[in-house]
């Protein structure tokens, strides 16, 4: 029999194409009654339609396909949740089914075993670490009024810095980050650092933002979707290693110092000392130095960048909305006066100020999209989802839903106030997520936001530098939604 090479080649090609298309169809619809979503090309999925501010793009998908829809990132299938109903059903009503975290190439670069608090899978190890960390931090006053003085101490340092740098354009981001980081330092190492004097501290703290930016970059996501690209991502991989490595070395040095000076007879004075004691008492191998290091890494990453970026946004919104700034200052003057700094107990008497902070958190939606994964095969709003399904909850879509918040792009604190000026309760608000993986630092973050924000505004006003256009209110999305670099003129109120 004579075999025609041309026919064989065509047959092989046709077979390969059919296989690729079949695999694509299988990946596109892994189970029956799977959530709908845009069709795309085999191999590329719907990537050609992708837009970099994904939170807005995902909202558009929600408008077209509903609150539960699917999306193909190359060959990777993701379910996207938009709107309060689907996100609440997943994170709260069916909390256990949606409590896992997905695996990601960027995470393997700094946390290959998925340890710690944020990236960890939903299992007993995560539960033990989260439970012990939360209980111990609460014991040291984390999120309680007894911790207020530690925060106020840092507010006072920030005020000193503002006084020394007023009446000229300045970039305040690093200084805010350092003040906020010192709060986590107090609770984990029992020590604060001088912002100007300690180069190791400065290096470690200022790299947190670089770490978030590099780890959240679209380029590294591409490495996750198309593994063959990994050898070409040396620059981005190096940036993650460098930034995370600096923070890691700083934290390991703190742990080593504590190990050297550990005195078994003394009561632990901070989180590291408590954890080291727990390792000694633990007979089942549940606690180790490796877990300790990752837990502290997570506390610094999740607890520093988030609060400091929110406060940086707060300054940006105040300088661009002088009417709101004035209203807040007027309320603080009436309730507290300018002679002393506001305390957390004042917040009940400052509804406009509270409403401004809520509106800020709504409009920036600091962590716009939170990654979750299913722990088992489950259903959501009538659709079937397989186990280990990557699910992204678009919190931004709640906070920018025009039905819940008319004219969502408008910054208007009054939407959080009743007609009589009292604070309005709002069930459709979740900047800290919800359910089993809800932010562990929510109570601390709320206290920090109130004390820093009111401390800054009771003493200073913020303005756009003369002769320059208003800074952009559009941010850049990495893990968090960050403002673009900007300068502000700080003026002491007299
Ligand atoms: C304005 C400040 C903050 C915001 C907006 C914020 C927001 C969030 C969000 C949206 C999540 C994910 C929730 C989910 O997956 O459903 C999260 C998780 C987390 N946050 Fe925060 N956070 C803030 C401050 C803090 C602080 C101060 C700490 C600790 C000191 C902290 C520690 C954590 C931890 C450990 C997790 C992981 C929880 C887990 O997966 O079990 N956060 N945060």
What are these regions (language model features)?
Residues 1-6, 13-16, 274-277, 390, ...:
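C-terminal helix/juxtamembrane-tail motif
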Residues 2-114, 124-128, 152-160, 243, ...:
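N-terminal membrane-proximal hinge/A-helix region immediately C-terminal to the signal-anchor transmembrane segment
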Residues 297, 302, 419-449, 474-476:
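Cytochrome P450 heme-thiolate "Cys pocket" and heme-binding signature region
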């Amino acid at each position: 029999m004579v075999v025609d090479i041309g026919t064989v080649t065509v047959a092989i090609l046709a077979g390969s194409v059919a296989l690729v298309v079949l695999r694509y169809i299988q990946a596109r619809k892994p189970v029956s009654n799977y959530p709908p979503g845009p069709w795309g090309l085999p191999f590329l999925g719907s990537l050609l339609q992708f837009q970099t501010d994904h939170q807005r793009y995902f909202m558009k998908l929600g408008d077209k396909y509903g609150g539960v829809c699917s999306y193909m990132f190359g060959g990777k299938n993701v379910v996207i949740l938009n709107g309060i109903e689907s996100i609440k059903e997943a994170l709260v009503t069916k909390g256990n089914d949606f409590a896992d975290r997905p695996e990601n190439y960027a995470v393997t670069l700094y946390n290959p075993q998925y340890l710690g608090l944020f990236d960890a899978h939903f299992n007993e190890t995560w539960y033990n670490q989260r439970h012990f960390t939360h209980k111990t931090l609460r014991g040291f006053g984390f999120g309680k009024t007894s911790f207020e003085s530690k925060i106020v101490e840092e507010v006072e340092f920030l005020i000193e810095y503002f006084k020394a740098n007023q009446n000229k354009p300045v970039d305040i981001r690093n200084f805010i980050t350092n003040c906020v980081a010192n709060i986590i330092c107090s609770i984990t190492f029992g020590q604060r650092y001088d912002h100007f004097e300690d180069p190791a501290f400065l290096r470690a703290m200022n790299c947190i933002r670089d770490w978030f930016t590099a780890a959240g970059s679209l380029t590294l996501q591409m490495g996750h979707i198309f593994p063959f690209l990994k050898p070409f991502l040396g620059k981005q991989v190096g940036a993650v290693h460098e930034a995370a490595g600096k923070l890691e070395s700083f934290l390991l040095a703190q742990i080593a110092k504590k190990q050297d000076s550990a005195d078994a007879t003394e009561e632990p004075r901070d989180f590291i000392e408590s954890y080291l004691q727990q390792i000694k008492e633990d007979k089942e191998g549940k606690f180790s130095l490796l877990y300790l290091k990752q837990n502290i890494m997570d506390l610094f990453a999740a607890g520093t960048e988030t609060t400091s970026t929110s406060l940086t946004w707060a300054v940006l919104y105040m300088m661009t909305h002088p009417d709101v700034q004035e209203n807040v200052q007027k309320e603080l003057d009436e309730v507290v006066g300018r002679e002393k700094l506001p305390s957390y107990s004042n917040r009940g008497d400052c509804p406009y100020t509270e409403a401004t902070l809520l509106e800020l958190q709504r409009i920036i939606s600091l962590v716009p999209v939170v990654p979750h994964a299913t722990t088992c095969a489950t259903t959501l709003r009538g659709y079937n989802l397989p186990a280990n399904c990557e699910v992204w909850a678009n919190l931004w879509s709640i906070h920018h839903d025009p039905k819940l918040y008319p004219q969502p792009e408008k910054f208007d604190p009054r939407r959080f106030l009743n007609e009589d000026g009292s604070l309005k309760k709002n069930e459709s608000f979740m900047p800290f997520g919800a359910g089993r993986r809800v932010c562990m630092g929510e109570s601390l973050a709320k206290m920090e936001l109130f004390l820093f924000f009111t401390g800054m505004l009771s003493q200073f006003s913020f303005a756009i530098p003369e002769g320059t256009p208003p800074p952009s209110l559009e941010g850049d999305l990495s893990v968090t939604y960050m403002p673009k670099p900007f300068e502000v003129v700080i003026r002491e109120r007299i």
